UniProtKB/Swiss-Prot annotation:
PANTHER family registered for this protein in UniProt: UPF0178 PROTEIN YAII (PTHR35146:SF1)
Organism: Sodalis glossinidius (strain morsitans)
Family: Belongs to the UPF0178 family.
HAMAP family: UPF0178
Protein name: UPF0178 protein SG1713
InterPro entries in UniProt: UPF0178 (IPR003791)
Lineage per the UniProt record: Bacteria, Pseudomonadati, Pseudomonadota, Gammaproteobacteria, Enterobacterales
Domain of life of the native organism: Bacteria
Amino acid sequence: MEIWVDADACPRVIKEILFRAAVRHEIQTTLVANQSLPVPPSRFIRTLRVAAGFDVVDNEIVKRAAAGDLVITADIPLAAEVLAKGALALNPRGELYQQATIREKLTLRDFMDTLRGSGIQTDGPPPLGQRERQEFARQLDKWLHQVQARR
């Protein structure tokens, strides 16, 4: 079981939580990005740099993620694809994407894209707060304990 991170848009504070968890639980964590990223020295943390381009990072994560892996992403289409492969998807706000509701989230995302494309301004998500960081850490810890129980 591994953790895959859609790292280009992942907040630094979430990456720091992941770094600590990777070392503490000795779980391979790979940050996939189209730019160079600083990471702490650890045999459990690595970066995978891919070419710049539309969905290149997403496609690489989909290709590499396996059933039971955890994917960290705020990208709903990416979450849908890894869920279909049997991986879990967690967004940086601590929401664990569910197979039962991912289609609804995709539809809402597409609708919001249509609104923005027609010139209607929509608000983005609020800043990442303490509550979201705690929920992310709680969900991550829950997954890590499940992995430890299987070892």
